[in-house]
């Protein structure tokens, strides 16, 4: 059983699932995996491009650097982290550096990690 936090982001355009839909997906996923929920972070009506302009996500990042209260951050969908692949890969890289991971009902950690590594290899060839 892993100690987990969950993150919810909504935005004003209505592209992402609602807060209630995200919470239901995250809680169902955590229960299915046997995870122990210990924290949550939210950014309501937050744009999806810049990671560091969101207080909830900044708090989660601070936790992985300083407090180490949890091992896994669960999101309903990968785009709840960011609308851009590069920002998502940056976040996955940061989690991997600190021994944490990102999980979603739509995508396991191994896929996030493999995609991030492929992206970083492609960027290093430029």
Residue ranges and their predicted role:
Residues 1-126:
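Short, structured surface patches at the beginning of a domain
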């Amino acid at each position: 059983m892993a100690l987990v936090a969950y993150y919810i982001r909504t935005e004003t355009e209505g592209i992402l699932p609602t807060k209630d839909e995200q919470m239901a997906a995250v809680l169902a996923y955590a229960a299915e995996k046997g995870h122990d929920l210990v924290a949550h972070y939210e950014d309501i009506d937050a744009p999806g491009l810049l990671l560091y302009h969101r207080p909830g996500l900044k708090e989660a990042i601070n936790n992985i650097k300083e407090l180490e209260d949890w091992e896994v951050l669960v999101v309903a969908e990968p785009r709840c982290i960011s609308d851009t692949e590069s920002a998502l890969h940056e976040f996955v890289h940061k989690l991997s550096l600190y021994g944490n991971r990102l999980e979603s009902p739509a995508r396991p950690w191994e896929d996030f990690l493999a995609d991030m590594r492929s992206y970083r290899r492609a960027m290093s060839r430029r």
